[in-house]
């Protein structure tokens, strides 16, 4: 950006990237995605390069649920998006369906996409995979440690799971293995919260882009598809 005279360096690290992975220790598995790094890198640019270059994350004000909800409507990308590090080592890049990233993305999309759509993306119903139980428990925040991967917070995971369970029960459908395990062992969280309408003010998004983000969040009332 500096050499080519560009004004912005925009990355895509959401609010959840700030959460540490080790309880009692502020250890982030990928420091470069945290707001702390963003602030320090901006300081470096301003002091050693040119202050006209702005480094920021466009997604910093948003949580994983908000991003998943918005993405659920971007149907043309459902066939091609990937977020699996294990599957990235294969050609073509695919979802391995056995790791914490795959399960997290499946969970976070489940309140907004019906099972048929999710299975079309992942080729499997990950909620029926008993081998994922330990990862499932860790993602919910009930394990010894949060998976050392780019996954969301237990608050986001528990909200998505609880909302999906309530949706399936309202529709009179049987709960898949992992969701049934959750209901039998944990208390469903309150889904009547503001979590889908929050705007994290700890961000460096330029003013000219703020309205776009807020319009997307506060005016988005899409139904499950």
Residue ranges, per PLM feature:
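Nucleotide-activated chemistry modules centered on ATP-dependent adenylation/adenylyltransferase
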Residues: 1-225
């Amino acid at each position: 950006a500096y050499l080519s005279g560009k004004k912005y360096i925009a990355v895509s690290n959401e609010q959840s990237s700030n959460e540490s992975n080790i309880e009692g220790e502020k250890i982030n598995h990928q420091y470069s995605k945290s707001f702390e790094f963003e602030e320090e890198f901006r300081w470096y640019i301003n002091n050693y390069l040119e202050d006209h270059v702005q480094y920021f994350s466009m997604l910093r004000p948003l949580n994983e649920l908000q991003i998943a909800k918005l993405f659920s409507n971007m149907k043309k990308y459902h066939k091609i998006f990937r977020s699996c590090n294990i599957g990235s080592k294969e050609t073509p890049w695919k979802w391995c369906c056995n790791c914490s990233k795959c399960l997290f993305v499946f969970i976070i999309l489940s309140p907004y996409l019906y099972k048929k759509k999710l299975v079309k993306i992942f080729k499997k119903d990950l909620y029926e995979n008993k081998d994922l139980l330990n990862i499932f428990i860790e993602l919910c925040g009930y394990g010894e440690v949060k998976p050392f991967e780019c996954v969301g917070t237990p608050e986001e995971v528990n909200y998505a799971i609880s909302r999906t369970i309530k949706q399936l029960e309202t529709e009179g459908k049987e709960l898949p293995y992992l969701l049934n395990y959750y209901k039998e062992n944990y208390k469903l969280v309150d889904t009547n919260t503001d979590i889908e309408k929050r705007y994290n003010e700890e961000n460096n998004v330029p003013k000219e882009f703020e309205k776009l983000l807020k319009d997307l969040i506060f005016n988005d009332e899409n139904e499950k598809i």
